[in-house]
Amino acid sequence: MSMLNGRRDEAERTGRKVNVAILGAGSIANTMATTLVKMAEDSRYSSWIHPYAVAARDKGRAEAFAAKYGFDTAYGSYADMAADDNVDLVYIATPHNFHAEQAIMCLKAGRNVLVEKAFTANAAQARALLNVAEETGLLATEAIWTRYQPSRDLINELVHSGELGTIRSVRAELSYELHGRDRITNPDLAGGALLDVGVYALNFIDMAVGADHGRSIADIVTTMVPYSTGVDATNTTVLTYDDGLLATATSSRAVASDRSGVICGDNGYAVVTNIN
C-alpha cells in the first residue's frame, strides 16, 4: 500500500511528497513527464509532487527516459515497479488494450492509479477495474484533462443560470486526420476513433448536460464507418436522455473537423469552439 494512503495529515506535517510513477515510456508518457517536472519546479506544487519512477518493457528505454527527466528509478518490468512501496500513484500510459489489466495489477499491489484515456477498452473492463478500486480503497480515475479545466465550471454556470432556457439538445464533434498509426487502426490495441478522440465528445456531453446534472441515458444509437481492419475510422453516437434531451457525438481519425460543442436551449444556444 502507498505510504500516503490514509496519512494526509502526517504527510503534510512531515513534507512527504506524492511519488508519481509512469507505466510506459511512449509519447504520452513523455508529455506527462514534462508536466510532472514542471510541477516539481513550480512553487505552487513543488511541496507535494515528486517524479519518482518509470517502467518500460525495455530496461534501457526506461533508464534513458529516467535520465532525460531526472526520475529517481527506472524499471524494466511493470510488475517490479508496482511492487515498489515508494510508489504512491501510477500513471498508466500504454495503449488502450492494456489499461484495465495494468491498472488492476497496480491497485492490487497497493498503488493509486491515474489511467490515460480511454479508461478501458469497454464497459466490462471498466466495471472490473472500479470494483478492484473499491475493494482496495484506492484511487482509480481517468486522465481526461477537459474535466479539470476552468471551462467546465463556466459551462456548468451557464447551463444552470437559465440563460439558455431548458436545454433541448447538445452536439459535440472532434476529429483529427491521422493515418498510418497502428494504435489507431489495430483492433488488438483497441484502436479506433471512438476510444482515441470520441471520448472527448462524449465527455463534453456528459459534463454539459448528462450524469453530472442528474440525467440518465434512456437510449443509445451508434453507427460507424470502419477502417479495413474493422475498427471505426468515423463514428456517431446519438444519446436520448430520460427527459427527452437529445445529444449527438461525432468523432473521426479519417477527417478533420472544427472540434466544436453546441448546447441548445429554448431561449438560446452556446458554442464552445474547441471541446478539447
What is each residue range found by the language model?
Residues 65-71, 129-133:
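Short, conserved SAM-binding/catalytic segment
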Residues 30, 100, 199:
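Residues forming the Rossmann-fold NAD(P)(H) cofactor-binding site
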Residues 146-220:
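Predominantly a Rossmann-like dinucleotide-binding segment in NAD(P)-dependent oxidoreductases
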Residues 2-4, 203-276:
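Contiguous beta-strand/loop segments that form the cofactor/metal-binding neighborhood of enzyme cores
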Residues 1-69:
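N-terminal Rossmann-like dinucleotide-binding module
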Residues 89, 95-96, 100-147:
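Beta-strand-loop-alpha-helix segment that lines the small-molecule cofactor/substrate pocket
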Residues 71-78:
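Conserved SAM-binding strand-loop segment of SAM-dependent methyltransferases
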